[in-house]
């Protein structure tokens, strides 16, 4: 049961590492810094991640409601695992947000 949660975290870490490697491999050129090129992929990835987190939370909530209603196909173990996965995804998103805000504050306080 806990193994599936850990594998989810490991897959998320692998995705994050792949994004970091891709960002490090790209050389910044003036054409790469246009707003549409620079923010399009990041914004799309951020929106996709938020959508996945929202879907996981909704699915976990629906499964919890089904368990409360006594649906025989839904076990307590599955409900608890899905709720923990949704919670972990949300906590990860909050940490990413906190780091983005900290980076923004640091950049905005730099003198030109």
Curated annotation (Swiss-Prot):
GO biological process: bacterial-type flagellum-dependent cell motility
Record keywords, A-Z: Bacterial flagellum
Annotated localization: Bacterial flagellum basal body
GO cellular component terms, semicolon-separated: bacterial-type flagellum basal body
Coiled-coil zones: none
Molecular function GO labels: cytoskeletal motor activity; structural molecule activity
InterPro entries membership: FliE
Family affiliation: Belongs to the FliE family.
Protein name: Flagellar hook-basal body complex protein FliE
The gene coding this protein: fliE
């Amino acid at each position: 049961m806990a193994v599936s949660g850990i594998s989810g975290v490991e897959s998320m870490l692998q995705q994050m590492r792949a994004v970091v490697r891709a960002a490090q491999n790209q050389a910044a050129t003036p054409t790469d810094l246009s707003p549409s090129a620079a923010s399009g992929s990041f914004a799309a990835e951020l929106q996709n991640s938020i959508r996945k987190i929202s879907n996981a939370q909704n699915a976990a909530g629906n499964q919890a409601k089904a368990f409360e209603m006594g649906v025989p196909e839904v076990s307590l173990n599955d409900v608890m695992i899905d709720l923990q996965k949704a919670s972990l995804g949300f906590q990860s998103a909050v940490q990413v947000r906190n780091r983005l805000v900290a980076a923004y504050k640091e950049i905005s306080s730099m003198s030109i």
